Amino acid sequence: MTARAEYLDHEDFLYRSHKLQELSELGVVLYPYEFPGVFSCEDIKKTFASQELGNSEAAMSRSTPRVRFAGRLVLFRAMGKNAFGQILDHNQTIQVMFNREFTSVHGLSEDAEITPIKFIEKKLDLGDILGIDGYLFFTHSGELTVLVETVTLLCKSLLSLPDKHAGLSDKEVRYRKRWLDLISSREVSDTFVKRSYIIKLIRNYMDAHGFLEVETPILQNIYGGAEAKPFTTTMEALHSEMFLRISLEIALKKILVGGAPRIYELGKVFRNEGIDRTHNPEFTMIEAYAAYMDYKEVMVFVENLVEHLVRAVNHDNTSLVYSYWKHGPQEVDFKAPWIRMTMKESIATYAGIDVDVHSDQKLKEILKKKTTFPETAFATASRGMLIAALFDELVSDNLIAPHHITDHPVETTPLCKTLRSGDTAFVERFESFCLGKELCNAYSELNDPIRQRELLEQQHTKKELLPDSECHPIDEEFLEALCQGMPPAGGFGIGVDRLVMILTNAASIRDVLYFPVMRRFDAEKTN
């Protein structure tokens, strides 16, 4: 049996629910179907804030502009024959004035034993959604205000709002009940407006540069394209195991084979792994592939894209301050070109280790001495994996300004071409870092089907020998598509949520997701 939700026994819920019957008896329509022809608060302010509107007497004579808008009542105070309120519409508020002689309540019976102003004072509550028809004026202090001619109750709020001054301090409540967070904090609302704007900017930039947006399956028979554990489910219609995608890469490359020269997808990806300040199991990525480009051209494209986004949200400045870096606020300049270093150069620069002069055994000793890795973690590691581990443990946190770290060990990915110089120990891959976190991953894509099969089979064999590792299946359809012929191409993937964190100055990835992954709600516990 499902436990009874505790809010159903809250005093404010019971008190406000009782008012519903009273409102109905007074002739007020509960939960009307529409309130057409509304302005937004933002539009009203933009249109009229700089105009000469006159005072409340001019509004009383109906000689000022008439407006219709709707929103949530978030502040109310009675003052003699007038009462003032604040109406919240998304992330903007407008002051309203209710007048004893001027304001009426839509639907209130003419023979009701309560005046409109008393109805407003006694029957409305903070949190109610109201429709407002009225006339604009400026108060003596210069505040744009609407003298309410008619107020319409559009939705009765049965639960009280968070305290206006204290707000929501409990992060658990903020993330689980995001609607309260949005109502009580304009800053939170602005963050999500900016997130939507950033995603729109990304799409517009990609479209303007000739990329075609495509959609590929979220549910897949075979997962791949990244080193990650998938979420699994069962498709009843086919009696088969399915996976939520861990990457967009494989499906996009199949489309590239089909002839689309520039493609991208911006969508959800799922990885059944850890949760922390910069990781959520469900997250948004953009992956893009451009025929006839290589990783150097992709590098230029990525830094120009990010610079464009920074300028767009930062008043055309390329430099912004991120307040939540681990050592305190940090100013970062995203103006292209960004710093470029090979992985080996970055280890020499930031860790003081020239890997070329050390044996594998010496690199293992350095890792043992300078990191918290258990010795067993790299006892049988190849040289390339040792180099990658040195970078991850000793370098990445130091990359504060935007960096492209290029030429990674071949062991780090089976999907990338080796260096054209002939050094087969390293691949044409770069990762972009900022504030110690990875922003982008990019390759000169491997399009040799024979070599691709060899690498995937080698990876599969190694994974089978490791009992705790995720053994990815080999996607034969992908290999068949490569045999059809895929043009040389450059590709990249960017974690959109992590980028939005920086651009909105958010402390955690949870602050830029409407509903981040949380533990399952237990109705038996206190809300």
Curated annotation (Swiss-Prot):
Mg(2+) 1 binds at E431, E438. Gene3D superfamilies: Bira Bifunctional Protein, Domain 2 (3.30.930.10), Nucleic acid-binding proteins (2.40.50.140). Keywords: Aminoacyl-tRNA synthetase, ATP-binding, Cytoplasm, Ligase, Magnesium, Metal-binding, Nucleotide-binding, Protein biosynthesis. It catalyses: tRNA(Lys) + L-lysine + ATP = L-lysyl-tRNA(Lys) + AMP + diphosphate. It is found in: Cytoplasm. It comes from the Bacteria. One of its GO terms (molecular function) is lysine-tRNA ligase activity. InterPro entries: Aa-tRNA-synt_II, aa-tRNA-synth_II, aa-tRNA-synth_II/BPL/LPL, Lys-tRNA-ligase_II, Lys-tRNA-ligase_II_N, Lys-tRNA-synth_II_C, NA-bd_OB-fold, NA-bd_OB_tRNA. Mg(2+) 2 binds at E438. Its cofactor is Mg(2+). Its EC number is 6.1.1.6. One of its GO terms (biological process) is lysyl-tRNA aminoacylation. GO terms for cellular component: cytosol. SUPFAM superfamilies: Class II aaRS and biotin synthetases, Nucleic acid-binding proteins. It is an enzyme of class 6 (ligase). Binds 3 Mg(2+) ions per subunit. Belongs to the class-II aminoacyl-tRNA synthetase family. HAMAP family: Lys_tRNA_synth_class2. NCBIfam families: lysS_bact, PRK00484.1. Homodimer. This is Lysine--tRNA ligase. It comes from Chlamydia pneumoniae. The lineage of its organism: Bacteria, Pseudomonadati, Chlamydiota, Chlamydiia, Chlamydiales. The gene is lysS.
